[in-house]
Amino acid sequence: MQGLTLVGSVWLGIGLALPLLVLVVNPLLVYLVARRVPWRPIPVVTTFPSVSMIVAVHNGAALMETKLDNALALDYPPAQLEIIVAADGCSDATEEFVARYGDRNVRLLRLDEHRGKTWALNTAVAEAHGELLVFSDADALLPAESLRQLVAPFADSTVGGVCGQRVIGERHGALREAQACYIDLDSRLKHWESRLGTLTSNDGKLYAIRRALFVPLPPAVTDDLFLALAVVRQGRGFVFAPQARALIPTPSRGAGHELERRRRIVAASLHGIRLQKVLLDPRRYGFFAWRLLINKVFRRLLPLALLLVMGGTLLLLPGHSWAWPLLLLQLLGYGLAFSHLLWPKIGIQPPPLLGKVSATGFYVALGVYGTLLGVGDFLRGRQPEKWTPRKTDGV
């Protein structure tokens, strides 16, 4: 019995300490350190470097007209902006839509075979002429000033890359609200990290790097995180420009899509970190190495922490009365999360607050399960399936 108590105590301690480190200690420490760093205002743009905006797309005909009209309406000198659309083995009318813009600084790269996003981006970069490479998704619409805001930090020669701010354009529905809440919290961490000069994450909806710092993307990585880390590895900063906004629809199209999306992102991002594991060496990269380890590796282990908490609680039930309330609290949390699926089946409309808590819990549970599957894929060396995005509800 003493042995089980010891094991249960260790499991419970680790299971509680890991979320505390990731969700409380790390953000608080980043915030406190960032406050001691003098704020550097973003330089005023007086010159406009040449920009190549790259959009990789697979069967995105429903999006291209809106996307290209939006890109061409950006407040940026047309002579300094080229738009490259890499059509990754499209079988719909994507190429026909893009071809109509051929006389307006829009270049179409026809990639006959569907080989995935990394191949499309590598091919497009090889054709790009801009000093800066801007990457933007087909479903991301930019306010007129966004490109100027994204480019402005490059006036500082120590900056090698800039991350934009994603904004969910419509927030109707509990799942959308939950995802928007997560994005808002993540953006706060980016803001504090940016004061330290380097982010530990990036956003594929809108970001930019210097073309001279581009590293060809290997298979099965997330392009945004891999390129951000490549910039840091080359000794440049990667910062956040919150005014460079990208308006997007809800990232998840439903529970199944969110699960698949989270699984793929986790496996691919861990693979990308493994390929650049030198960044985890604090002797060379100092505080950044610890932040990367906590925010991008330990965060992926949170599902295991929840399993340890449950397992530790069960082992401590005999002879420890305080373990029973802890078990009930966990069961209540899981019950609230999965009640989100139950309400429609039994025809009950829950009170607004209960419905919101239930939907948020369900979104968190989906993310936890998808993360667990992604970690499993990474440990088994299972490559994520080929990039086949769902950018509209009908695609």
PLM region spans:
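Short aromatic/hydrophobic "clamp" motif used to bind/position activated sugar donors
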Residues: 133
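Long helical/loop segments within the catalytic core of UDP-sugar-dependent glycosyltransferases
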Residues: 33-34, 119-120, 144-221, 363
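Catalytic donor/gating beta->alpha subdomain of glycosyltransferases that bind UDP-sugars
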Residues: 154-185, 219, 223-295, 366-369, ...
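A conserved acidic beta->alpha catalytic loop
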Residues: 70, 87-96, 113, 140
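Conserved donor nucleotide-binding strand/loop of the catalytic core
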Residues: 80-85, 95-127, 173, 177, ...
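Cell-envelope/extracellular polymer assembly enzymes that use nucleotide-activated donors
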Residues: 49-52, 82, 226
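N-terminal membrane-anchoring/stem segments of glycan-assembly enzymes
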Residues: 1-47
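Short, acidic, metal-binding catalytic loop of nucleotide-sugar glycosyltransferases
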Residues: 69-80
